Amino acid sequence: MKTPTTELDNTAEGAEPASGVRPDSSPRAAVSRRYGWLSRLRSYFIFDPLIWLVTVILGIVSIPVSLLGEKGRILHGFARFWSQLIMKIICSPTTVTGLDALDTSRPLVYAVNHASALDIPVLYVYLPFQFRIAFKKALLAYPIVGWHLRRSGQICINQQNPAASIGSIRAALKSLKSGLPLVIFPEGGRTRDGQVKPFLPGAFFLAIKAQVDIVPVALVGTYELLPMDTYHIKCRPLEMRVGQPIATAGYTPRNMAELSDKVHRAVEDLHAKPVGQ
């Protein structure tokens, strides 16, 4: 049952507006109505400039520092510090559930829904261990970000055709077998409507080849915080919900789709839980 908008208070419930155009009832429209011009000013003139400033300064400082010692571990520390600053800037407290039940001393693949550019800072702050991220090749074109992805040992994967990324796959398998966890975004990109998109089966190729368990992770609230195609950051509480590991034993590249569906259902179930549960 539809609710009339404020401007149409006198319109009969469920009736067509006089203009013949129904108000936008999409998730993004609902979010936009909740956060007005004051929120936009705060975002455009405080949050966004501070985030860019922190990113540029730390990005420049990290270049010479990364030449010392093991570059992946040093740059992970920089990424974590950068993420902590961003989370303080955007004033979005995050609740984590389920992580304390995991044995994080063993290598695992974390399958995470991707709703926002700010998913990355959330993961760096609230996953309290070194990890690497599987990412799309297109990200290498971004200044500073692309350089860090190359230097920090992140994994560039073609999720549509994993065999085309054989060098990266070998490096990722080596990392997993050495005990370094991997974070993947199986949707292949950010959602445009806040819902968990279908997963690309190829995203699970590494987990199957390495025979390591997959942990479903749902980030809740990051879409409303900063959806695609906008710089308007809307402060709000967030949740990171971590599920039980899903074994890859018995799966092969031939039946990756079955594993993909199983993990997708687990992430969707976590994401759909009422807030606070």
Task: Describe every region a protein language model picked out.
Residues 1-34, 38-41, 166-277:
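Non-catalytic C-terminal accessory region of glycerolipid acyltransferases
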Residues 30, 43-51, 79-135:
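Conserved H-X4-D acyltransferase segment
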Residues 33-95, 147-151:
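A transmembrane-helix-recognition feature enriched in membrane-embedded lipid enzymes
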Residues 83, 154-158, 189:
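Short, basic, glycine/proline-bearing loop/turn elements
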Residues 97, 134-136, 158-159, 186, ...:
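Thr-Gly-centered strand-to-loop micro-motif
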Residues 115-171:
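Membrane-embedded segments
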